[in-house]
């Protein structure tokens, strides 16, 4: 990611070091056992990365989308599960930062900046599945008391058992439609909140993603992250850009690592009987070339999108969606080519390309899914509303 200034470069360098010295060291075990990468998340906090985008006046790094994308890209090269946890944390903390209604905003952001508070998003629900913009749950006024109560069945929440807070969505009281919504901050350690089961997925196996049942959780106006009915707007204007940029950068990081691993394999592996290298085969060089081109195409679109977000126009939301779509597709294509170029060494897990191959596919089913993105982009290009 180009265009990072001196202040941001310090964080990117720190991310690269942590990714190499901590994330990559534990990535194979995290993947094999499906455990939460506690060592990696702790290392992010120790190195000031947990508060990367928190306001500077509250102790955070005050960095924007460009540095965020560059940091996530580096983290994904070491451990995509950690990069996913981090993306959800930053996206959720940016909702907190954007709030003008949350009573505990500043105290939470100070803790985020200090690496003492991990947060995440809790949007998708069992009834509406990956259509995260249509919550089934609804806030209900508490009988005879001030405040609200909500029950929900969140289908998948990253860092479900490890987060200190969830940024959650629900319909407002008496909502006429699912889009008549509100975002609120939930404390997952409350007795009304219960995680169910463990995550045993194909890829991103260490992100502690689990269904969460919420039964009669009590909250007040001071827990709301936006005004009643403004949930959809906040999702569109804050959640979606940060999440899309972060997951695009994660996919790009997977691509970069796949390219480097494949290159090293082609250079370092030999046909002893002929005295030649794998790189001497034109078909393998061609696959590596295709991998590199697809990777840099996706990275270039994301860099352009970040520049658009610095100076938004009416077309900026389309670029946000396109960058996520392009990067997710690139990650699938690039890791597929890496598996073919790696041959038996890749398929037998002698090189970690197989883990990247699986991690790359998780993005396709993560809302907004690839199918949703194609539809959203098509709707935008033809003048239809996004949701």
Please place each PLM-identified region on the residue numbering:
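Residue-level recognition of alpha-helical structural elements
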Residues: 4, 8, 33, 37, ...
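C-terminal helix-coil-helix/basic helical segment that borders enzyme active sites and/or dimer interfaces
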Residues: 24-32, 296-326, 339-347
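Glycine-rich flavin
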Residues: 38-46, 50-158
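A short core secondary-structure module
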Residues: 153-194
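Glycine-rich phosphate/pyrophosphate-binding beta-alpha loops
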Residues: 155-160, 240-246, 363-366
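Glycine-rich beta->alpha junctions and the first turn(s) of the following alpha-helix
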Residues: 199-294
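Alpha-helical transition-metal enzyme core signature, strongest for iron centers
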Residues: 252-255, 259, 291-298, 302, ...
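Glycine-rich phosphate/cofactor-binding loops in nucleotide/flavin-utilizing enzymes
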Residues: 344-387
């Amino acid at each position: 990611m180009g265009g990072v200034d001196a202040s941001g470069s310090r964080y990117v360098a720190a991310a690269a070091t942590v990714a190499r010295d901590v994330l990559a060291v534990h990535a194979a075990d995290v993947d094999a056992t499906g455990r939460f990468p506690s060592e990696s998340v702790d290392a992010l906090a120790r190195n000031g990365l947990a508060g990367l985008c928190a306001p500077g006046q509250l102790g955070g790094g005050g960095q924007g989308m460009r540095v965020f994308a560059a940091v996530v890209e580096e983290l994904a090269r070491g451990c995509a599960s950690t990069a996913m946890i981090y993306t959800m944390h930053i996206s959720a903390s940016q909702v907190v930062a954007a709030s003008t209604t949350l009573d505990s905003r500043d105290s939470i952001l100070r803790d985020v900046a200090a690496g003492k508070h991990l947060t995440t998003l809790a949007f998708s629900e069992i009834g509406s599945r990956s259509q995260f913009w249509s919550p089934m749950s609804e806030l209900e006024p508490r009988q005879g008391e001030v405040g609200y109560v909500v029950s929900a069945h969140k289908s998948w929440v990253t860092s479900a058992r490890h987060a200190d807070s969830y940024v959650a969505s629900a319909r407002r009281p008496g909502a006429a439609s699912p889009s008549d919504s509100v975002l609120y901050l939930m404390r997952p350690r409350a007795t009304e909140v219960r995680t169910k089961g463990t995550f045993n997925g194909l890829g991103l196996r260490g992100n502690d993603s689990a269904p969460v049942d919420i039964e009669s959780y009590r909250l007040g106006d001071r827990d709301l992250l936006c005004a009643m009915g403004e949930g959809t707007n906040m999702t569109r204007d804050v959640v979606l850009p940060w999440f899309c940029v972060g997951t695009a950068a994660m996919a790009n990081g997977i691509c970069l690592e796949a390219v480097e691993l494949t290159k090293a394999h082609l250079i370092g592996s030999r046909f002893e009987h002929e005295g030649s290298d794998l790189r001497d085969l034109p078909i393998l060089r061609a696959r590596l070339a295709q991998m590199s081109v697809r990777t840099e195409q996706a990275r270039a679109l994301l860099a352009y999108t970040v520049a658009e977000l610095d100076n938004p126009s009416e077309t900026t939301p389309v670029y946000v969606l396109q960058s996520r779509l392009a990067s997710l597709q690139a990650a699938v294509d690039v890791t597929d080519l890496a598996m073919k170029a790696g041959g038996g060494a890749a398929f037998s897990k002698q090189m970690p390309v197989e883990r990247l191959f699986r991690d790359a596919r998780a993005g396709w089913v993560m809302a907004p899914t690839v199918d949703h993105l194609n539809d959203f982009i098509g709707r935008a290009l033809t003048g239809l509303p996004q949701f």
